[in-house]
Amino acid sequence: MSEARRDSTSSLQRKKPPWLKLDIPSAAPPAAEEPSFLQPLRRQVFLRSVSMPAETAHISSPHCELRRPVLQRQTSITQTIRRGAADWFGVSKESESTQKWQRKSIRHCSQRYGKLKPQVLRELDLPSQDNVSLTSTETPPPLYVGPCQLGMQKIIDPLARGRAFRVADDAAEGLSAPHTPVTPGAASLCSFSSSRSGFHRLPRRRKRESVAKMSFRAAAALMKGRSVRDGTLRRAQRRSFTPASFLEEDTTDFPDELDTSFFAREGILHEELSTYPDEVFESPSEAALKDWEKAPEQADLTGGALDRSELERSHLMLPLERGWRKQKEGAAAPQPKVRLRQEVVSTAGPRRGQRIAVPVRKLFAREKRPYGLGMVGRLTNRTYRKRIDSFVKRQIEDMDDHRPFFTYWLTFVHSLVTVLAVCIYGIAPVGFSQHETVDSVLRNRGVYENVKYVQQENFWIGPSSEALIHLGAKFSPCMRQDPQVHSFIRAAREREKHSACCVRNDRSGCVQTSEEECSSTLAVWVKWPVHPSAPELAGHKRQFGSVCHQDPRVCDEPSSEDPHEWPEDITRWPICTKNSAGNHTNHPHMDCVITGRPCCIGTKGRCEITSREYCDFMRGYFHEEATLCSQVHCMDDVCGLLPFLNPEVPDQFYRLWLSLFLHAGILHCLVSICFQMTVLRDLEKLAGWHRIAIIYLLSGVTGNLASAIFLPYRAEVGPAGSQFGILACLFVELFQSWQILARPWRAFFKLLAVVLFLFTFGLLPWIDNFAHISGFISGLFLSFAFLPYISFGKFDLYRKRCQIIVFQVVFLGLLAGLVVLFYFYPVRCEWCEFLTCIPFTDKFCEKYELDAQLH
């Protein structure tokens, strides 16, 4: 048998022409094949290009069953923490999130800070600043074509999407007709995936549908007159290329891109063939992918040319040829006009859900925020330079927008708290001056007197300052033991220590008062030990007293018994809750009718023993259970919120961030909401909620702390420091994009003018410039530390790492210094009040107690 085979082989060799050379390679084992991580195109039919014939569309797949998995060592906890910290700060070398941030930054600059440099635009191939999109700045990667296709003629693919396929020279001239690329072999570049999605990645698993998405889909189905189930089960039967929601992570439609809806049937035109961001639609499930892989290979369904009349009826346009504009001189000869024959391929596998209707879809459509060119950039007419480095270009293209969750949550909390505060505490008199109320009120002496109550007006249309302090406003006496307030309270207690009960001769009543205030002709001042009713303590008469309606001899709870006898000092006496003898003790200070009890008035801990009518008229806190001012803690009543751990030492330090969620009135809240829905929301889409939340809260806390140091006796509410900290982020964003802006100095002076205007506006009452200044400085440090930005080379990357450490240390030093000044070394600055309020009139700033005079 072997001899016969050798004879046949030799005969064939004799018949072979001398010029013919046969080179038959030996069969190699499957394991020796070069691994390829591309899936077979025949199985994933939804990846087939419209320009590639089915019989030539084959890409080798790896023999996974013949390859052993590569064993890798598990990453240590230290490496994981280091890599995560580097990714979060934006200094990682191979981080996908860092690349996304950097590629998005330039796009943000183009809308916020003005035009870009011409070289930047030429690098990005963006002739227009109007539509700077993610997909328009991408060039799809070359497709691998097998050896059998290398000899095929290249075709023109008019379906390539995006502005990235325009000719660079034409883009510089501002022309708008797209340049049609030439694809390798018969494979279409745009039919597989973009450079961001990557053909080497598998489709992602579907996310769970949210309630809002299902509700909108049901509403859209009802509007179209069909059941929700029918709309859900409906799926596309014919498709010419991959849906964008299958492979692309984040794409955005723009007017200059091709409307791809002509590939589907007319009945499902508005439901199945829209390409919108990934957060609106979902990716196929793993079960669907397995069904696609297990499905038998089907014959390709190739259709003829599309009917032009049908497309016109559907209001669609099929690009059949290149543009008809005038070509640039010296350009290549125009290629012949070829009408493209479209293929339709069947898609297998179930699909969950249904895409929402067009009106609802347009409602949720949002544009990308180019780095440095956000809302403020559009207002100040900023643009990129005409040329940007390719490394910077890749950083911008990989950036994604974030959802402004923190802005929405903050706006909701601000609105809710403001509405509740106005409903519960009411609205104070509106204006810029003082509001005086005069009335005749019964006082502690038993006669009516004309008294005047002076209230600060609030032009923000909101509660009074006392109500704001009770809600949690920034107020230094509630956050620490203020030296002046503490000395004022100690002086009042010293006067009360030498007081006694003044009993009127007509037995109309009695009140605790000093000897000067008690009439010697109409009343008797019962003073121990002069008065015969003085009790004894340790064998001798008490030296201080008496106290109206309180005596250690008749009090049962708490009783004055050895070893728990009441002290000599009456200011240290407890509140007696039960007397044993009632009103018949034969002691004048016990048998009289008391007409005055402690009342806390004002915001500085001032206490008066007066009648309830007078206390209510002065908007004070009346204590029916006490007889002395030393038995009550007025600062605890004034501050409200959680009680002090030590009643003598205020400790509500949490007012530093609690006041960020309060507002002085309705207008104040509306101003904050406008700022948040414009500037804050725009920046959060760039940096994410976690970075913006850190900068917002820490800037506000630092600003309130500085305000509490220099303006300790002024109630301050609102996120003034936080808002200036967010404005500092705009400056940092401008500095980081300085090299790619066409006119950076113009953008800088515009931002500086806005900040100076707001600072000048802070010279009016109720607006704190100390919070503005400190919040801006702290926000500047935090922005340099926490906001990732574009890096212009390896040296710039190392510089940012040093910058993060330096600015974090500087901010911590600033915060520590303010804490030391606030708690350990209080500062009294007389001229500092002129930085936050200029007294244009005598009472313009006096009503806000900037002189810190206690009364």
From Swiss-Prot:
Low complexity bias located where? 25-36
Entry-annotated residues carrying Phosphothreonine: T180, T183
**Which residues does the entry place in the Lumenal compartment?**
433-655, 713-714, 768-772, 825-855
Question: Cellular location of this protein?
Answer: Endoplasmic reticulum membrane; Golgi apparatus membrane
Membrane topology term: Multi-pass membrane protein
| Gene3D superfamilies cross-referenced by the UniProt entry | Rhomboid-like
| InterPro entries in the record | Inactive_Rhomboid, iRhom1_2_N, Peptidase_S54_rhomboid_dom, Rhomboid-like_sf
Recite the UniProt keywords alphabetically. Endoplasmic reticulum, Glycoprotein, Golgi apparatus, Growth factor binding, Membrane, Phosphoprotein, Protein transport, Transmembrane, Transmembrane helix, Transport
Cytoplasmic topology ranges: 1-411, 677-691, 736-746, 794-803
The cross-references to SUPFAM superfamilies, in alphabetical order and at most eight, read: Rhomboid-like (SSF144091)
A GO molecular-function term, please? growth factor binding
Q: Where is this region: Disordered?
A: 1-36
* Chain ranges passing through the membrane: 412-432, 656-676, 692-712, 715-735, 747-767, 773-793, 804-824
Which GO cellular component does the record give, naming just one? Golgi membrane
* Coiled-coil parts of chain: none
| Function, as annotated | Regulates ADAM17 protease, a sheddase of the epidermal growth factor (EGF) receptor ligands and TNF, thereby plays a role in sleep, cell survival, proliferation, migration and inflammation. Does not exhibit any protease activity on its own.
Q: How does it assemble?
A: Homodimer, or homooligomer. Interacts with TGFA and HBEGF. Interacts with EGF; may retain EGF in the endoplasmic reticulum and regulates its degradation through the endoplasmic reticulum-associated degradation (ERAD). Interacts (via cytoplasmic N-terminus) with FRMD8/iTAP; this interaction leads to mutual protein stabilization. Interacts with ADAM17/TACE.
Question: What's the name of the protein?
Answer: Inactive rhomboid protein 1
Native organism: Plecturocebus moloch (Dusky titi monkey)
**What gene does this protein come from?**
RHBDF1
